[in-house]
Amino acid sequence: MIDAKTKVLGLLAHPIGHSLSPLIQNTLATVCGENVAYLPFEVKNPDELGAAIRGAHALGIAGFNVTVPYKEAVIPHLLGLGEEARLIGAVNTLVRTEEGYVGHNTDLAGMATMLARKNLRTEGAHILLLGAGGAARSAAMLAATGGAAELVILNRNTARAEALAKAVRDINPSLTVRAAALEYWRELPGNDYLCIQCTSVGMWPNAEESIVEDPRFFEKLSAAADIVYTPEETKFLRLARAAGKPVAGGLAMLISQGAHAFSLWTGKRCTAEQEEELLTLVKGALPA
């Protein structure tokens, strides 16, 4: 029950109607016995983002999740950044201090959980990223810090892929990193790439789209993961599964990164069993 002691949290995004974060965070609050109310706050005009954050701080709002299109745009309006946010160059969680909000990033932890649930490991792996946006930065830094043998970044905008490759080299100069256009997949040697699809292609309502559909692409993979979680299994993952490859969907990443954010706000960390229960609950809320 909301009262004068309720801690208000929220989500900053545009658009916002599709988000599962209110369901996840309010369920976590119930499970963990926290007096929390988590609400969506849509900022339609990017020019008003700074004003929204200043107003939220003045009102005492305890924290936010941040998603598209504000994960990088929010940074100039913050008091500081946590280590992973600095590493990735993007923010998905704000934690209030008396002086302002500090930005954190729980995407890396969520992505690691998504892979670990399917026994997929970055150590010694040849990792192939599709995309070069915020989610791809998280995946790239996971490769850079997680012992990968090689990282290949493919993106329609090759300049963004090259910029991300440079950022990875700055973090881990010994890692072999290549960046190229999406079509470069045809030139890839071998068939042991752990591919992480990091774009929004295939997200509901465009669930019949896949960033790559050629069966020869999937022959080059050892496994496939997709950050998209609506639908639970994207067309990209269906094609990978049809090629006999293990797959990992983005819903586990969403749940895990949400749980890590909740811990930053409240100090409460849910158990692995509670995360599994939450995963089952959220599956029921996905679009048909």
Where are these regions (language model features)?
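Residues at the starts of beta-strands that form the adenosine-phosphate
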Residues: V8, H126, A149-E150, T176, ...
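Adenosine-phosphate binding glycine-rich loop
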Residues: I227-A288
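Short helix-loop-beta connector
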Residues: T97, L120-H126, F218-K220
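Rossmann-like adenosine-cofactor binding region
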Residues: S174-V247
